[in-house]
Amino acid sequence: SGFGTPAAVAAPLMVAMGFQAAGAVMLGMMIQSTAVTFGAVGTPVLVGVQEGVASPEFLAMLTASGTSMGQYVNAVAVRAAVIHGITGTLMPTLMVVMMTRFFGSNRSWTEGLSILPFTLFGGIAFTVPYVMTAWILGPEFPSLVGGLVGLAIVSFTTRRGFLVPEDTWDFPDRKNWPSDWSSDLDKKSNAVGERAHMSSPKAWAPYLILAFFLILSRL
């Protein structure tokens, strides 16, 4: 992950699932928020903070206080995780509200709030392991571990109907979509035939293996 690839990958997948191209781009850009702090295995913090403050005067100040650069970077990571975790908890709700307001039949803000318990739960499922990982392991893994753990929790509970609202919401009929909602990708995705099926464990195996070895290297 990192360098904007999650949004670049997620938006076409959402279009293939039936989202409008404009809506998929909007949601993809919104989700590029909380996790970005520790994207690319912590590059913004590890490189940005260390290179940004590593002046002789600052290093001397750290030495005088008995703090190493590594300890300082980890402290920055924890504080950033807490601040961004608070806003990240609300991000799923904001995404749904924006979707119902700008891409729903009724153009309603409040329709999106009907799923508030579920979206708050989804946000917490990501941000709690996100903050804990920053505190325990440092800046390399909060986004990676938070995303994988959150996905596992929400997928498991959703299959069992936990906090899933009884009412369903959908986009307007495709024939009523304004022209600026769609792109050529919509037409191409509709024309794609059936592909070979891949099991979920096989599809997720590369990401899980990568996460395992990255975490193992820091223990």
Residue ranges of model-derived segments:
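Long, contiguous bundles of hydrophobic transmembrane helices that form the permeation core
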Residues: 89-219
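Hydrophobic transmembrane alpha-helices that form the pore/transport pathway of multi-pass ion
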Residues: 1-113
